[in-house]
């Protein structure tokens, strides 16, 4: 495409042949005047080539970004290593667990990369590797694995797994099969089912994979790839050793031509083409003379060549095709074989003709040799039993069949049946009325699709509603019982279902009472446990108890009577622990009314681990792309989040002077641990408690001066604002302004347009599915705020008879603020703005977007309880990967087995953790990466590398107290420094310094609280006066779920070192999965939460400032 265009006038039109097809087409479109100016022509063509190259590079970049985000990073790696093009059929086989609609977006982008690779574009995608994840990009296929040492993706299945164990190293004297590297595996590795499935694809797309024991090939074998058995003639050595071009290497044209010539010697005659020149000699001889070009009718009927009409003298198919023959009988089986299905539909799809000129290597497509070498050939007597005479076969068609149309039902029956068994393939719709195989016997794999038994194929995709009327004469259902044992089978299946139901009720009894007991866990108060003494103090400390909460007063009332933001703390009698106000909002009635109640098959987003959520986001992006590309008219290669941004903001804005309005949600998470400021939560609570009956809430405007005063109150006192006696319309307008002033829309800049497209183009039947996928792709803080707002608006709609605010009315009022519609963007040029609004009325695009936003928000308000569930389809498609992403919480007995020491117990494991903490402190915590923090704290992290994407965080601070007092504050007085601390109890005391401890942390309403069950131990007799507290999650039978979600503490260690003058240095190392958050959220916010925690512990020791003048002592 980028051939040089002559610029000399003498060249004229003689250089037309040197142009690319695009250049020739452009040249022919020009008039004669333009053609007479070669210099002008050359400039036009050069500019066209440059623009085309830039467009192709952008498409390639978008495709690679999408591949990584959707769970296909291995293909992006191969493209960046200049190892494209690749075979699309092999990619489909690697992802055979995906639906056809989900594979199409992947194939579309791989075809784009194949096209870009054929154009020889420069591949210089320097992807900056950030610290957002401990692992490389996630791959959804279990046939690929990531090598941490080489930082590369490679195939799990190697090619040698296709061969029997005795043939993997080759026969004596033959050349053994060479090892394949990770870069070659995508082009040369095929598992056994993949080789078979290349030749068997159904028209419907859902059954595109054949069974492992079935390979529908009767055509002569053509070699399009290197042979893998030493008993076969070997291709030239340089073909085997030239799978790809190395990166940045440009092979010469002569080398490419010679390579193609060698490929031609290996390629047989295809179904639609022949070799040029019949007198060619020196080619690779595979077998004796054989029919290469069969009539189309022979291929369609799967006919078998019988020399001289004698079936007995005909050689087995393997021998006819030049494969080594074996003397095994049909009753013997190779160890590598799998049992074949008893039913198989005839393979009528003829073999495709694939081009051999593939850059960088070859794929083992159409290679039936692999299936044949691993199989024994049957004897002559079994061949006689295998094939019946063609005269004994009768093909039936329905009586109402119209000539020229495809029949709705076909039957191939034998006039002399020797079988008595019946079989039904429910997956393919094929009914076999054939013989029963002898146990241990099976048909050869190459002929598995040619069963000569009675067969009926019913096609449910043929137009017509009288299928059974058409096949009634064929099957005669009233006379013959086709399925004599079907009732017994169904009865047996129903019995198994009852057994499974009984078992599930015994294992999960809470599922029976889920509807009646919803909301009760987490609300029950703890019984007062016995007083627990610390061995280093000898006196009792405050007993475990439940802090005062809204639960003790009112559970179901919508009108909470608690004074906003003020709660009493129980005084422990210690000077620094005097009564402190708790400013964290506890909104239990809102939390209860919208507590998630998903079905057992549809888990909630808030219960997913970080690894599970990352996996679900890959499948959500894949499903959302498939839906949008099917319905939308936008770009087919990438979405708004995939477009490369050439202009980046160099300086991160500073939000120190802002507290509530105009601050990103993630900054609120870093400051307070919750994405919504406390004052905004209090505003929603005030509206929900006192103002839901106000007519036209969010529709009627408030007074600007009072709204401005409310904004100032929020900025000055973001933790506590009293909204009593405030106008409902003023507070509602202030809430709308909060969302309007966010730096980006609530639906984010990346996905706002996608949400609008869903309600513009996607059909109503698929909108919920598309919105669920898009919500999974939202940032965690945006998704949590969206859920809180939608649940609140749903409460407003429930009183529509009083406030007259329907879902559509609310959506019309709030959609512009949530989507940032009709707002002039800063990056828009003044000329564009002036042209757009010169007419004084919005254009049609703006009207469509406003309508889609209103309809979408109204739909989300009504479906707020279902939007945040994980679709069952995503969990089913992820297969074992979803289960493996769950964090296994060990029991006390399992902790000892994690150490290599014999006879190790959980005490040994805990002592091992304490010794490791002391060693790191002695080495000054080497290998940790420091990052910025606030409030005079030190923050650092370290990647673990155990397969979990979460990092290990470390926060340090100096405390004005000795180590023993600090340990007691962390161990027994958490309610003094953690405002989210709701409930706690000691489940079991193992010894004086070890216990099973359970506690609950509150979350922003209506999100569920987090329940923790940890094994913890503490030491006070360490060298240099140090104290430690180590804890981790364990499974305990007596620890019932008290909160909404059971969180997992993978590691939590407190190290308290004396600093002199009664001071200590507190270091907290933790790694916790709170559930419901993605790895990106932990990277952006969790470290700041750890730093804020140690700062609160430090601040709990600071004495209260007494009022009055300072006195001298």
From Swiss-Prot:
Changing residue 740 to E: Loss of RhoGAP activity. It is found in: Cytoplasm; Membrane; Mitochondrion membrane; Lipid droplet. The record marks 699 as: Arginine finger. Residues 162-254, 307-346, 536-580 are annotated as: Disordered. One of its GO terms (biological process) is regulation of small GTPase mediated signal transduction. The modification Phosphoserine is found at residue 411. Residues 177-188, 536-549 have a biased composition (Polar residues). Residues 663-868 form the Rho-GAP domain. Pfam families: RhoGAP, SAM_2, START. SUPFAM superfamilies: Bet v1-like, GTPase activation domain, GAP, SAM/Pointed domain. It is a peripheral membrane protein. GO terms for cellular component: cytosol; lipid droplet; mitochondrial membrane. The modification N-acetylmethionine is found at residue 1. Residues 197-213, 326-344 have a biased composition (Low complexity). Residues 55-122 form the SAM domain. Residues 899-1107 form the START domain. Ubiquitously expressed. Underexpressed in hepatocellular carcinoma cells and some breast cancer cell lines. One of its GO terms (molecular function) is lipid binding. Keywords: Acetylation, Cytoplasm, GTPase activation, Lipid droplet, Membrane, Mitochondrion, Phosphoprotein, Tumor suppressor. It comes from the Eukaryota. GTPase-activating protein for RhoA, and perhaps for Cdc42. May be involved in regulation of cytoskeletal reorganization, cell proliferation and cell motility. Acts a tumor suppressor in hepatocellular carcinoma cells. Homodimer. Interacts with TAX1BP1. This is StAR-related lipid transfer protein 13. The lineage of its organism: Eukaryota, Metazoa, Chordata, Craniata, Vertebrata. The gene is STARD13.
């Amino acid at each position: 495409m980028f051939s040089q265009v002559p610029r000399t006038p003498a060249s004229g039109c003689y250089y037309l042949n040197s142009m690319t097809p695009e250049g020739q087409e452009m040249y022919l479109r020009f008039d004669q005047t333009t053609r007479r100016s070669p210099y002008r022509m050359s400039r036009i063509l050069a500019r066209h080539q440059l623009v085309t190259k830039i467009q192709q590079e952008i498409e390639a970049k978008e495709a690679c970004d999408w591949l990584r985000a959707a769970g296909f990073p291995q293909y992006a790696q191969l493209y960046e290593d200049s190892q494209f093009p690749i075979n699309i059929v092999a990619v489909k086989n690697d992802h055979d667990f995906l639906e056809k609609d989900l594979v199409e977006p992947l194939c579309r982008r791989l075809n784009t990369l194949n096209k870009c690779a054929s154009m020889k574009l420069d591949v210089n995608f320097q992807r900056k590797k950030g610290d957002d994840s401990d692992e490389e990009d996630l791959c959804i296929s279990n046939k690929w694995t990531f090598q941490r040492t080489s930082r590369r993706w490679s195939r799990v299945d190697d090619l040698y797994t296709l061969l029997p164990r005795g043939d993997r190293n080759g026969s004596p004297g033959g050349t053994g099969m060479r090892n394949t590297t990770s870069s070659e595996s995508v082009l040369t590795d095929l598992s056994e089912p993949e080789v078979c499935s290349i030749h068997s694809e159904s028209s419907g797309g859902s059954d595109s994979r054949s069974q492992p024991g079935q390979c529908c090939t009767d055509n002569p074998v053509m070699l399009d790839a290197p042979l893998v058995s030493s008993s076969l003639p070997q291709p030239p050595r340089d073909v085997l050793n030239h799978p790809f071009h190395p990166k940045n290497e440009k092979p010469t044209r002569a080398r490419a031509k010679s390579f193609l010539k060698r490929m031609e010697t290996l390629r047989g005659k295809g179904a639609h083409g022949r070799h040029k020149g019949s007198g060619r000699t020196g080619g690779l001889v595979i077998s004796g003379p054989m029919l290469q070009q069969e009539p189309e009718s022979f291929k369609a009927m799967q006919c078998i060549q019988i020399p001289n009409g004698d079936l007995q003298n005909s050689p087995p198919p393997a021998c006819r095709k030049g494969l080594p023959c074996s003397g095994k009988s049909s009753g013997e089986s190779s160890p590598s074989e799998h049992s074949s299905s008893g039913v198989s539909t005839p393979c009528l799809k003829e073999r495709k003709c694939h081009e051999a000129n593939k850059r960088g290597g070859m794929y083992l497509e159409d290679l039936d040799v692999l299936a044949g070498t691993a199989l024994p050939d049957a004897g002559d007597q079994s061949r006689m039993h295998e094939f019946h005479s063609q005269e004994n076969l009768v093909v039936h068609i329905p009586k109402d069949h119209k000539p020229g149309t495809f029949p709705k039902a076909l039957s191939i029956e034998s006039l002399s049946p020797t079988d008595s068994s019946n079989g039904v393939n429910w997956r393919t719709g094929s009914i076999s009325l054939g013989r029963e195989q002898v146990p241990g016997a099976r048909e050869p794999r190459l002929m598995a699709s040619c069963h000569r038994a009675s067969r009926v194929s019913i096609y449910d995709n043929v137009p017509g509603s009288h299928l059974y009327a058409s096949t009634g004469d064929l099957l005669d259902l009233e006379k013959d019982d086709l399925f004599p044992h079907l009732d017994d089978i169904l009865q047996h299946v129903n019995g198994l279902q009852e057994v499974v139901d009984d078992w599930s009720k015994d294992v999960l009894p809470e599922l029976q009472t889920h509807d009646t007991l919803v909301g009760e866990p987490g609300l029950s108060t703890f019984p007062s446990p016995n007083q627990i003494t610390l061995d280093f103090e000898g006196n009792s400390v405050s007993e475990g108890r439940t802090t005062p909460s809204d639960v003790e007063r009112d559970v179901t009332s919508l009108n909470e009577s608690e004074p906003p933001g003020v709660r009493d703390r129980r005084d422990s009698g210690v000077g620094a622990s005097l009564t402190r106000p708790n400013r964290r909002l506890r909104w239990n009635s809102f939390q209860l009314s919208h507590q998630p109640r998903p079905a057992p098959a549809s888990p909630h987003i808030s219960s997913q681990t970080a690894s599970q959520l990352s996996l679900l986001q890959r499948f959500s992006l894949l499903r959302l792309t498939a839906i949008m590309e099917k319905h939308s008219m936008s770009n087919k290669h990438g979405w708004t989040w995939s477009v490369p941004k050439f202009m980046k903001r160099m300086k991160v804005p500073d939000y120190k002077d802002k507290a509530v309005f105009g601050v990103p949600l993630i900054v609120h998470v870093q400051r307070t641990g919750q994405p919504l400021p406390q004052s905004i939560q209090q505003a929603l609570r005030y509206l929900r408690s006192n103002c839901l009956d106000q007519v036209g809430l969010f529709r009627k405007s408030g007074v600007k001066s009072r709204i401005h005063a409310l904004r100032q109150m929020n900025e000055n006192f973001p933790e506590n604002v009293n909204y009593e006696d405030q106008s409902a319309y003023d507070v509602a307008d202030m809430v709308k302004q909060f969302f309007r002033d966010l730096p980006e829309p609530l639906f984010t800049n990346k996905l706002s347009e996608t949400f609008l497209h869903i309600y513009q183009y996607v059909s109503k039947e698929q909108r919920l599915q598309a919105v669920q996928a898009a919500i999974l792709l939202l940032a965690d803080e945006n998704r949590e705020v969206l859920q809180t707002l939608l649940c609140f608006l749903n409460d407003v709609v429930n009183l529509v008879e009083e406030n007259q605010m329907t879902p559509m009315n609310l959506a019309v009022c709030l959609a512009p603020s949530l989507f940032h519609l009709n707002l002039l963007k800063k990056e828009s040029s003044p000329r564009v703005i002036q042209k757009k609004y010169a007419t004084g009325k919005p254009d049609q695009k703006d009207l469509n977007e406003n309508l889609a936003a209103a309809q979408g928000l109204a739909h989300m308000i009504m479906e707020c309880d279902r939007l945040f569930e994980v679709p069952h389809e995503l969990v089913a498609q992820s297969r074992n990967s979803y289960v493996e992403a769950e964090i296994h919480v060990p029991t006390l007995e399992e902790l000892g087995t994690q150490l290599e020491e014999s006879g190790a117990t959980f005490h040994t494991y805990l002592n091992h953790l304490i010794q490791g903490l002391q060693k790191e402190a002695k080495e000054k915590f080497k290998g940790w990466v420091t990052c910025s923090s606030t409030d005079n704290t030190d923050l650092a992290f370290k990647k673990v590398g155990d397969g979990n994407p979460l990092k290990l965080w470390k926060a340090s601070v100096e405390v004005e107290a000795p180590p023993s007092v600090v340990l007691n504050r962390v161990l027994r007085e958490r309610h003094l420094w953690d405002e989210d601390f709701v409930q706690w109890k000691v489940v079991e005391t193992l010894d004086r310094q070890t216990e099973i401890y359970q506690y609950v942390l509150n979350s922003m309403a209506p999100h569920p609280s987090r329940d923790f069950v940890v094994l913890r131990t503490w030491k006070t007799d360490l060298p240099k006066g140090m104290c430690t507290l180590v804890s981790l999650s364990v499974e305990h039978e007596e620890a019932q779920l008290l909160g909404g979600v059971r969180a997992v503490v993978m590691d939590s260690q407190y190290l308290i070192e004396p600093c002199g003058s009664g001071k200590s240095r507190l270091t907290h190392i933790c790694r916790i999965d709170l559930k419901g958050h993605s790895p990106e959220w932990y990277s952006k916010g969790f470290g700041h939460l750890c730093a804020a925690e140690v700062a609160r512990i430090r601040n709990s020791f600071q004495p209260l400032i007494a009022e009055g003048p300072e006195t001298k002592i």
